[in-house]
Curated annotation (Swiss-Prot):
Lipid attachment, kind N-myristoyl glycine: G2
One Pfam family it belongs to: G-alpha
Region entry G1 motif, spans: 36-49
Region (G2 motif) location: 173-181
GO biological process, one term: pheromone-dependent signal transduction involved in conjugation with cellular fusion
Full protein name: Guanine nucleotide-binding protein subunit alpha
Subunit-structure text: G proteins are composed of 3 units; alpha, beta and gamma. The alpha chain contains the guanine nucleotide binding site.
Binding residues for Mg(2+): S48, T181
Length: 353
């Protein structure tokens, strides 16, 4: 009896052991088909926009129900941007035309978050008329002197469409919407047999301590820089230049002991807004830049500033791309280009190269 009982226990233990071994084998196979990337960059560099592009490119885009859910975000972004400009006027020594005083009061009386299926007519009319005011347009031209969302002008120019009956946000409306990222989000998509996992972390300073949870076993880092913010200050600390902050962050990530051999895909983002700022003097913010208003020279200069920070050039490669994260076709092209790079890195990581 004792021997039979013992054999039964042994059989159960062996079955459990075999099950664990089989699961470990399955996990190893899955790991070989999985590419993990960590998405990094300072606040408002375009990380969340890239993730939205992933959904458009690899997940079939947004359903009408999902698009409808973005209305409140888009309406709120639009009103918040107008309020930011109105609040900045006194410091800029600018004023509205007297006829717009009542419209100013209308916008300032609106709550920060708009919870409505349709943009109220009085708010839409106020935004439309204020956007035609010369003083307000001059404030937008000087937006580097205060905090203003990149999407402000786009939404102001779209106010007729956004306030029309039956409005449903377009892909471009959604791409330009802004919600501060907090915590860690994971985006997964498949290309062929490979599964890509992209981890996004909050870009603001207060969120960076959370990045450590994503550090292990990533195939590559995707680091975003907003080129257009070379003349702007941080949201959290208006004494710190945003480009200098991005350089400091890139330095700390690139040369971290966690990433000695981890390659970096560098997105030099917002090239469209960067080009619009060409008349602005870069030498004010980077005295060693001597390229004047030349776009290519400015791009090359900033690329060199980042790449030159790499202290492990022998073991770490930096792959740079100039991007406009709101341009789906361009991002699709860039993603296709880096998939080959990621595959090579992954095969090397798995010991298959």
């Amino acid at each position: 009896m004792g021997c039979v009982q013992s054999t039964g226990v042994d059989d159960e233990a062996k079955a459990r052991n075999d099950e664990i071994e089989n699961q470990l084998k399955r996990d190893r196979v899955m790991a070989k088909n999985e590419i993990k990337m960590l998405l990094l960059g300072a606040g408002e560099s375009g990380k969340s926009t890239v993730l939205k592009q992933m959904k458009l490119i690899h997940h079939g885009g947004y359903s009408d129900q999902e698009k409808d859910s973005y209305k409140e975000i888009i309406f709120s972004n639009t009103v918040q941007s107008m309020r930011a400009i109105l609040d900045a006027l006194p410091a800029l020594d600018l004023a509205l035309q007297p006829a717009n005083d009542a419209r100013r009061a209308t916008i300032l009386a609106v709550p920060g978050q708009i919870e409505a299926e349709v943009l109220p007519r009085d708010i839409a009319d106020a935004i439309r008329q204020l956007w035609a005011d010369p003083g307000l347009k001059e404030a937008v031209r000087r937006s580097r002197e205060f905090q203003l969302n990149d999407s402000a002008v786009y939404y102001f120019n779209s106010i007729d469409r956004m306030s029309a009956p039956g409005y449903l946000p377009t892909d471009q409306d959604i791409l330009r919407s802004r919600v501060k990222t907090t915590g860690i989000t994971e985006t997964t998509f498949k290309v062929g047999e490979l599964t890509y996992k992209l981890f996004d972390v909050g870009g603001q300073r207060s969120e960076r301590k959370k990045w450590i949870h994503c550090f292990e076993n990533v195939t590559a880092l995707v680091f975003l820089v907003s080129l257009s913010e070379y003349d702007q200050m941080l949201y959290e600390d208006e004494s710190v230049n945003r480009m200098q902050e991005a350089l400091t962050l890139f330095d700390s990530i690139c040369n971290s002991r966690w990433f000695v051999k981890t390659s970096i895909i560098l997105f030099l983002n917002k090239i469209d807004l960067f080009a619009e700022k060409l008349p602005a003097r870069r030498s004010t913010y980077f005295p060693d830049f001597t390229g004047g208003d030349n776009y290519d020279a400015a791009c090359d200069y900033l690329l060199h500033r980042f790449v030159s920070l790499n202290q492990s050039a022998a073991t770490k490669q930096i792959y740079a791309h100039y991007t406009c994260a709101t341009d789906t076709q361009q991002i699709k092209f860039v993603l296709s280009a880096i998939q080959d790079i990621l595959l090579q890195l992954h095969l090397r990581e798995c010991g298959l190269l």
